[in-house]
Amino acid sequence: MLLQRRFEERCAEAYALGKIGGFCHLYIGQEAVSTGSISLLRPDDYIITTYRDHGQALARGMSPRVVMAELFGRIDGCARGKGGSMHMFDKSLNFLGGHGIVGAHVPLATGVGFAIKYRGGDQVCVCFMGESVVNTGAFHEALNMAGLWKLPVVYIIENNRYGMGTALERASAIHDIFERGSSYNIPREQCDGQDVFAVRSAVREAIDRARTESLPTLLEVRTYRFMGHSMSDAVSGTYRSKAELDEYMKRDPIMLLRMQMQEQGELSEDDLHKLDEELKATVQDAWDFAEQSPEPPLEALYEDVLVDTTSDQIAEPVAAD
């Protein structure tokens, strides 16, 4: 969690300095969601997420160097500098990408779940999304299929209360949006997204259900972003007040975890300081690596446009039983 926080803080700095271009959506305030869920996954499980993807990428184990290089648009990034902030990807980790179109990745997650079931595996696909996704048509079609075919997908709604600048209450007739799962006859639950242990408990149950019973789950995780929607958005003062932000920051997930660990005697101030300094050094190393990485050559624009159909990585069809 602390690595994600320190990484995102430096991303904000890099964006202000013009080292990161294009869109950039920070994960500050929501770190308990990625940490509490991804820490439960096996290496062969799958993850697919939205454009706010840096936190999940780091939680899954992507190298901070590679993530930062991608943000800087450099050739050593995970997409060779072509994807940028919204399109982290690592096939070796079954991290199937951040996706820039709201809701477009939800059918892909459902397709991954179908592939798992078709091949007789016991893996799980975890699909992260923001609360605005629930008002897209693709969301409904994908969850209906998952409920109908009983697919091993855990759909995690990171409800941070605002879709860009629109409050949930102004956009959704149902405010407890996990209840939408009842329309597709799938298990559903709501949990506190600022408490990493609450997230972990809820996601563990959903993963067990997917792995042992091949059943999907719709999980609404109530969280809050401490930054604007993107780097072009004001932190407060437009659609939300500073007083509201200050109130939510009293439940900073990292602060809550630190307090719990200190109360239980598991973490001292010296331990925390040492860890923090180590993580800051890790992020600085990622920054230095990204700056030293070359920019992609112009001809790289024409590479990776089409899949190489001669590759032995193309999966052979699997006969159904």
PLM feature spans:
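C-terminal intrinsically disordered, low-complexity extensions immediately downstream
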Residues: D288, Q292-D321
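Cofactor-/ligand-binding subdomain signature composed of acidic, glycine-rich
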Residues: L2-G21, P43, L256, E263, ...
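Cofactor-binding active-site loop characterized by glycine-rich and histidine/acidic residues
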Residues: E9-E13, L17-W149, A167-A173, F178, ...
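Short alpha-helical scaffolding segments that buttress acidic/His motifs in well-ordered protein cores
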Residues: M1-L2, M68
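A short structural micro-motif
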Residues: Q4, P43, A57, E278-D285, ...
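Conserved phosphate/pyrophosphate-binding and hydrolysis machinery centered on Walker-type P-loop NTPases
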Residues: Y27, D276, E295
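Glycine-rich ThDP/TPP pyrophosphate-binding loop and its adjacent helix/strand module
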Residues: F95-Q292
